Structures are given as C-alpha cells and as structure tokens.
Amino acid sequence: MQRLKKGDKVRVISGSEKGKEGIILQVFPELNTAQVEGVNVRKRHKKANQENQEGGIVDIAVPLNMSKLALIDNKAKGKTTRIKYGFDKNNKKVRISKISNSEIGSK
C-alpha cells in the first residue's frame, strides 16, 4: 500500500522547493516519485504540430522524490504527519495519521 496517494495534500520538506504545498496529481510507485500541483515547475519548449498550431514555452510540473514530501493533516491544524496503518470496522486496511490518530480519507 502506497503511503502517499493521488489527491493527498502534501508539503515539500527539503530541496529548493522547501515549504511549498500542493495536491498530488500523479504517483509513480516504480520510480518512487510524485507529481505535485504547482511545485517543481519547469519550462519546456514545445514544437508546433497539427494539434497545437503554435509552439512555445510551456510550464510542466516535474515529479519529486517521495522522500521530499510530507502529508498535511487538516485535523492537526495543517501540520505535517507521518502515516501508520490500521484496520477499520470492516477489516479493511486504512491509513491513519500519527498526530491526530484519525483515519486519512481514501481518495
């Protein structure tokens, strides 16, 4: 079970983007990276083609390593938290915040 999932709100804890917050758009488990909205944005030059008549410079969010991301717990006043696992009433495995000890909503 992946600790961080698509739709989670995260904060960058190290690197040049430290302190920035965003929502995970896409997770790449085999590369241990995640693409976060508005974080680690790079400029890419796009060539003109049939679909896009105009070429130009486009901003693209580049994936960050998961070790640089921490989950934000809304119930703990926006603090970052670690994740542990437990079972709900239906014996389904769920993610639980270590700070507020509450279940993290599945997306």
Curated annotation (Swiss-Prot):
Per UniProt, the keywords (alphabetical) are:
Ribonucleoprotein, Ribosomal protein, RNA-binding, rRNA-binding
The record's section on Pfam families has: KOW (PF00467), ribosomal_L24 (PF17136)
The UniProt entry, under SMART domains, shows: KOW
GO MF entry, a single one: structural constituent of ribosome
- Which domain of life does the protein's organism represent? Bacteria
Q: How does it assemble?
A: Part of the 50S ribosomal subunit.
Q: Which family does it belong to?
A: Belongs to the universal ribosomal protein uL24 family.
Role played = One of two assembly initiator proteins, it binds directly to the 5'-end of the 23S rRNA, where it nucleates assembly of the 50S subunit. One of the proteins that surrounds the polypeptide exit tunnel on the outside of the subunit.
Indicate what this protein is called per its UniProt record. Answer: Large ribosomal subunit protein uL24
Q: Which gene encodes it?
A: rplX
